[in-house]
Amino acid sequence: MTELGFIILRHVKDKNFNKYWQKSYECIRKFYPENKILIIDDNSNYDLIDTFYENHKLYKTKILRSEYKGRGELLPYYYFNRLRCFDVACIIHDNVFINKNIDFSTTYFVPTAVEL
């Protein structure tokens, strides 16, 4: 069976952004309570991060501080390829909220032609 995991790209630069990643995490847990989550931190201000939340509220979740600061959009793909934590990944930013269950299943992928 194919294992689906989630990757959240996080960059906390103020208190609102700290709330965003937590809400993003909670939305995933609402619909996918047992799936693994990898949070990739891209050079956040750790003075603004709620460490109690990180240490006590996260389940089946790993937080990874990126060694490549400021690389943003490339980091989830790099670490997914490098770590292979799960078979299939849903990659989102820390301000994206999943509001319903998504059917990630597919029997095949057929590329479509692009007309110019």
Regions found by a protein language model. Name each.
Residues 1-116:
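ER/Golgi luminal nucleotide-sugar-dependent glycosyltransferases, focusing on the catalytic module
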